[in-house]
A protein has these predicted regions:
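Conserved GNAT acetyl-CoA-binding A-motif
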Residues: 104-116
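Conserved active-site alpha-helix within GNAT-family acetyltransferase domains
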Residues: 94, 117-136, 140, 146-147
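Conserved beta-strand in the GNAT
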Residues: 56, 62-70, 77, 82
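Conserved acetyl-CoA-binding loop-helix of GNAT-fold acetyltransferases
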Residues: 83, 89-102, 124-128
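Active-site rim helix/loop that mediates acceptor-substrate recognition in acyltransferases
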Residues: 33-56, 68
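Conserved acetyl-CoA binding element of GNAT-fold acetyltransferases
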Residues: 74-85, 114, 139
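A conserved beta-turn-beta hairpin within the catalytic core of GNAT-like acetyltransferases
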Residues: 70-79, 88, 133-134
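Short amphipathic alpha-helix that is part of the acyltransferase structural core
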Residues: 1-42
Length: 149
């Protein structure tokens, strides 16, 4: 199984494939997402398939982030990528993403990701990693939308 280790910021990091993501990380991800738009989050979870590949990133053995992927004939569909708040803006999400992307390309596949339109941070992350939007779902504006017209 692919695994990588690297030294950065005077810490030892590792990224590896695991069978299951630790529940505390999954719950933290759901909590962070829930502030965006509960209706969209529910829709997202209806679309999401069970992951086939889970990546876990650790700092000196402590879980700090993960990614879940569903593989089909053409794509590795990246449904979730999450780094704990205190470890963001350090390039760790990019390291995790690049490791996944390299493994994906080694399998002869393309990478595809799903994110919510109101998640500006995710949009910026993907664009900085050379991933661009291809599809938008448009609907009537909701009363509790984060955006003003």
């Amino acid at each position: 199984m692919p695994k990588t280790e690297f030294q950065d910021l005077d810490y030892q990091f590792s990224i590896e494939i695991v069978k299951n993501i630790p529940i505390e990380l999954k719950n933290e991800f759901k909590t962070v997402l829930s502030v965006i738009d509960k209706e969209l989050i529910n829709y997202y979870y209806e679309l999401k398939k069970d992951p086939k590949i889970n990546y876990l990133i650790c700092i000196e053995g402590n879980h700090i982030g993960y990614s879940s992927i569903y593989e089909d004939d053409t794509y590795w569909n990246l449904y979730e990528i999450y780094i704990k708040e205190e470890f963001r803006e350090l390039g760790l999400g990019t390291r995790l993403f690049q490791f996944i992307k390299n493994n994906c390309q080694n399998e002869g596949k393309q990478i595809r990701s799903y994110t919510l339109p109101s998640d500006r941070r995710a949009k910026n992350f993907y664009e900085s990693n050379m991933i661009t939007a291809r599809v938008l779902i448009m609907e009537d504006k909701r009363a509790k939308s984060r955006y003003k017209i």
